[in-house]
């Protein structure tokens, strides 16, 4: 910054400049040892630190003093080359030089100073200050120093030089700590406060010798003093950033005191920036600091959410046992239940425990989730959606197709004369019926008197139909078991297998104290019947998901490693998935070793690729969220030859970093997609394009398709006056072939690029910025990627935006539904269902109706459209399958695992959903939960409270108390809360026991408010 020219100065400015120039001239003519130097320096310091003038411009004193900076440095150098004695004048001069360096600009530098400088010259501001502090400390340690000087030195504070100076000093401190050599020395130093209080016995100068080991403790003390000032004056975000850079994040705890609002702002900021930690260790340190601050402040609900995010069982126990308020303790149990964390707490020894055995039983009961069904029916009653819906209500505006010809429901039961044309048509109605009525316990298709709908299916269709009974009775274990019981005694093995799966589905996210599943299913896992074993495996997978039950290893591991002659690949794959769901995120060694061994034994070809992908998915689920701890498994997978080995590697890596927002991992997945080895050959690409064009034109001859054969049989039966269609028509098998061409069996629509695309979405999950960038990231694969990459993009978007119908995502998927690639369009249709699952989104509903009109002759696409419609209307618009909760802070691993199984199967849905593995659609069950806010009194009785629900507004890092919602509407609880919405109470009569109003919220009467 150039000093103002004399021609541009007013008379007052000229006089002021002359006064300052005279003071500097007198100082230079004297020596620092002289008594006259001290008052001159005090006057200069007063002028420099005097505030005045416009806040947008530099004070005039600094504008006039800056040109004397070189002269002041020469004065100090002359002193040091002379006696070099410490004095109060030296301290003032060094501080003044440091202050002038803070406002210096490149224009102020001389030609010599503009040359490449030494490392020390980059930190003059910091070095001058360190030199001044060291000189002052030596004077205080010297007994000969006068008391008056001691008092003056002790009274000087770092904040005396103003905010701008502190900001400049903190910037240089951060730059100093970012030097590699500084980090090396810092890591080798002992982390104790004693090292900061050591006074050098001999005189040292950091200006003459750039001593990193000496500078580190001094700059750390500066950081502590600066952040103390920042916290006291409302600059807590700057203070947190500085402490993070100098690795002193733990010191935040003692700087906040008991200020409730300050703790709220600080912890919210720490939690939000923890996602951007360079390493998992750094992220964990930040979260632990926030946890300890909240726990010390008695904010148990917020501390519990951090403990759940850390996945630390001990911290969860500490929060529970440390909570003395009974209502808050019940609220903590409800939070754990919504997270899928069952609290199997034992009594804590010692006097510190305040919980009685009755309290522990109550906590265990609430966290088991057995309350969910009853409260959900209260929600349904209040919203007037308790009446069951039929699939025909969903398809009312759909055109008549081969899949719904002659389908009628009258008076709540099936017509005796109804004719069913295909297994796919029946199966689509079964899934839609189950999704729409899930959790309500009643429907108009299966659970009605004299209904034989379950038997209008074939093989795995029978299994899915029987299993759907459990989905209808979701969360209600007792009612579910009673309704499923009659199917267990069927003579058809597929129906019996479906009943076993239904037992588990009805127990999803519920841990009943009696554990009826162990008696019903465990002995079935050892049955020689492969179909029954598959059903039992599915039931165990659903019923024990996330329970970490070790006793199940001895049942499931032998099925996983078994030969194909013992169990088909589908059964072994589902056993592996069951292990993954039960031990999700634990990295259980026995389960991981079994799956890796199975992958090693599988042949290197593209046959049975859907099952191989499920093995890879199961292994990834075991490593969900384990980050660097999964490296051992990834290294072991390098020994697996073939495409399925590379798929497993990428799947494990994607799951290990799920929800981390790790940009480096996303770049690695993009690099995998761009690698030359994953680019399809031109011949294969052309063949894929030909296949896509061919599938869009279905065969016209009834002999070319099992569906047309079934339709012809139905028509003939009706023309001849046949009445018992069940005897005259055999339903078509799920997974019919459109032609006899086996060339497509040699090629797989799934490769490692497909998994890499899913990995990008998994990594970005939960990060709002990362998810928003997905649309941009996927533009390149859609435009230039291989067919496998393009086909995975819609599913990746659906995975990141499950039950979150963002307009931008809906627009992108709507365009892809008309893609020239048959598989891309089919995947986009299914993705629309996942994105809108449980929301009744009108835009998606209209889009699916239009698509149904466009694909009336394509039975496979029509089936997918109906599945998407069923997902869209899931729970009559009261549920969600998003794995995120607590305003996006927490990730339900069990929900994400189940969703990932379905999405992995969807990569090749023609060979899974419509062929050999339609039951993979049922794996959305662990992800289903109500999207609600329901209020209870401390005695757990339901109470209606006025509340506001609006769009979520991010207030972290903002000044003041901003509104946390916008565009809100006022309702009475219970209310529905969307993915991007937030709720808050609209009355002061009640006080919630948690700050996040989501799920089940306990409210207490506010005794400080008098109602009129």
Model-derived regions: residue spans:
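Extended alpha-helical assembly domains of large eukaryotic scaffold proteins
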Residues: 2-996, 1001-1002
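Long mid-to-C-terminal assembly/interaction modules of large eukaryotic proteins
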Residues: 1010-1011
């Amino acid at each position: 910054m150039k000093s103002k020219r004399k021609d541009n100065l007013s008379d007052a400015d000229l006089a002021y400049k002359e006064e300052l120039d005279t003071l500097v001239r007198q100082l230079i003519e004297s020596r620092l040892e002289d008594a006259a130097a001290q008052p001159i320096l005090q006057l200069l310091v007063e002028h420099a630190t005097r505030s005045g003038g416009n806040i947008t411009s530099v004070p005039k004193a600094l504008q006039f003093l800056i040109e004397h900076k070189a002269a002041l440095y020469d004065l100090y150098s002359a002193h040091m080359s002379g006696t070099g004695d410490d004095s109060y004048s030296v301290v003032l001069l060094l501080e003044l030089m440091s202050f002038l360096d803070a406002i210096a600009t490149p224009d102020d530098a001389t030609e010599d100073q503009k040359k490449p400088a030494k490392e020390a010259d980059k930190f003059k501001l910091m070095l001058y200050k360190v030199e001044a502090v060291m000189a002052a400390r030596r004077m205080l340690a010297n007994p000969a120093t006068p008391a008056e000087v001691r008092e003056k030195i002790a009274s000087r504070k770092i904040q005396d030089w103003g905010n701008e100076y502190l900001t400049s000093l903190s910037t240089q401190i951060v730059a100093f700590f970012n030097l590699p050599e500084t980090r090396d020395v810092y890591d080798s130093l002992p982390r104790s406060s004693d090292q900061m209080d050591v006074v050098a016995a001999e005189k040292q100068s950091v200006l003459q010798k750039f001593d990193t080991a000496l500078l580190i403790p001094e700059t750390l003390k500066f950081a502590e003093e600066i952040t103390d000032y920042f916290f006291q004056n409302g600059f807590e975000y700057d203070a947190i950033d500085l402490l993070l850079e100098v690795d002193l994040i733990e010191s935040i705890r003692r700087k906040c005191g008991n200020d409730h609002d300050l703790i709220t702002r600080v912890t919210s900021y720490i939690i939000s920036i923890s996602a951007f930690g360079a390493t998992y260790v750094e992220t964990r340190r930040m979260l632990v600091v926030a946890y300890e601050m909240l726990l010390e402040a008695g904010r148990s609900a917020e501390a519990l959410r951090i403990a759940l995010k850390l996945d630390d069982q001990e911290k969860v126990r500490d929060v529970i046992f440390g909570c003395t308020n009974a209502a808050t303790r019940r609220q903590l149990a409800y939070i754990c239940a919504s997270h899928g964390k069952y609290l199997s707490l034992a009594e804590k020894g010692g006097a510190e425990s305040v919980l009685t055995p009755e309290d522990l039983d109550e906590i265990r009961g609430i966290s088991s989730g057995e309350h969910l069904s009853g409260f959900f029916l209260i929600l349904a009653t209040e919203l007037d959606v308790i009446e069951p819906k039929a699939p025909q209500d969903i398809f009312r505006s759909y055109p008549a197709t081969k899949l719904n010809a002659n389908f009628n429901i009258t008076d709540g039961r099936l017509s005796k004369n109804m004719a069913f044309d295909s297994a796919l048509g029946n199966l689509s109605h079964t899934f839609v019926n189950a999704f729409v009525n899930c959790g309500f316990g009643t429907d108009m298709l299966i659970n009605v008197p004299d209904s034989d709908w379950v038997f209008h299916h074939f093989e795995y269709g029978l299994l899915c139909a029987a299993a759907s009974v459990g989905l209808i009775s979701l969360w209600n274990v007792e009612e579910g078991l009673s309704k499923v019981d009659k199917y267990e005694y069927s003579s058809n093995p597929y129906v019996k297998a479906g009943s076993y799966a239904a037992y588990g589905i009805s127990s999803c996210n519920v841990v009943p104290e009696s554990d009826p599943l162990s008696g019903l299913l465990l002995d079935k896992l050892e049955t020689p019947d492969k179909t029954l074993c598959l059903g039992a495996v599915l039931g165990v997978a659903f019923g024990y998901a996330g329970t970490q039950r070790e006793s199940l290893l001895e049942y499931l591991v032998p099925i996983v490693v078994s030969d194909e002659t013992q169990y088909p690949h589908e059964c072994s794959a589902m056993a592996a998935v069951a292990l993954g769901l039960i031990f999700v995120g634990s990295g259980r060694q026995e389960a991981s070793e079994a799956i890796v061994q199975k992958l090693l034994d599988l042949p290197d070809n593209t046959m049975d690729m859907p099952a191989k992908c499920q093995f890879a998915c199961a292994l990834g689920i075991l490593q969900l969220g384990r980050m660097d701890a999964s490296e051992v498994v990834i290294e072991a997978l390098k020994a697996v030859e073939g495409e399925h080995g590379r798929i497993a590697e990428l799947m494990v890596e994607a799951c290990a970093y799920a929800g981390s927002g790790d940009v480096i991992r996303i770049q690695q997945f993009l690099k995998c997609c761009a690698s030359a080895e994953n680019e399809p050959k031109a011949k294969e690409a052309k063949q894929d394009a030909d296949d896509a064009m061919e599938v869009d034109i279905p065969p016209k001859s009834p002999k070319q398709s099992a569906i047309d054969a079934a339709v012809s049989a139905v028509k003939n039966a009706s023309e001849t006056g046949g009445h018992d269609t069940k005897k005259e028509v055999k339903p078509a098998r799920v997974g019919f072939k459109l032609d006899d061409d086996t060339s497509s069996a040699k090629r797989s629509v799934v490769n490692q690029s497909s998994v890499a695309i899913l990995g990008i979405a998994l990594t970005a999950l939960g990060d709002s910025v990362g998810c928003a960038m997905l649309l941009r990231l996927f533009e390149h694969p859609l435009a230039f990627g291989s067919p496998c990459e393009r086909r995975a993009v819609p599913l990746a978007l659906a995975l990141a935006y499950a039950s979150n119908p963002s307009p931008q995502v809906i627009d992108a998927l709507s365009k892809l539904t008309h893609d020239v690639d048959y598989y891309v369009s089919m995947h986009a249709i299914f993705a629309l269902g996942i994105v809108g699952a449980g929301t009744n989104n009108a835009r998606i509903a209209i889009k699916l109706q239009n698509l149904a009109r466009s694909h009336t002759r394509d039975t496979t696409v029509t089936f997918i459209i109906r599945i998407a419609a069923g997902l869209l209307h899931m729970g009559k618009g009261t549920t969600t399958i998003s794995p995120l909760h607590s305003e996006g802070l927490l990730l339900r691993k069990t929900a994400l695992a189940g969703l990932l199984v379905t999405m992995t199967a969807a990569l090749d849905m023609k060979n899974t959903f419509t062929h050999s593995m339609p039951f993979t659609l049922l794996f959305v069950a662990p992800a289903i939960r109500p999207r609600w806010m329901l209020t209870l009194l401390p005695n757990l009785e339901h109470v209606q409270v006025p509340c506001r629900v609006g769009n979520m507004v991010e207030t972290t890092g903002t000044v003041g108390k901003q509104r946390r919602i916008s565009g809100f509407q006022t309702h009475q609880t219970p209310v529905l809360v969307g993915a991007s919405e937030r709720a808050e109470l609209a009355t002061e009569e009640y006080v919630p026991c948690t700050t996040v109003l989501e799920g089940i919220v306990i409210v207490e009467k506010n005794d400080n408010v008098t109602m009129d």
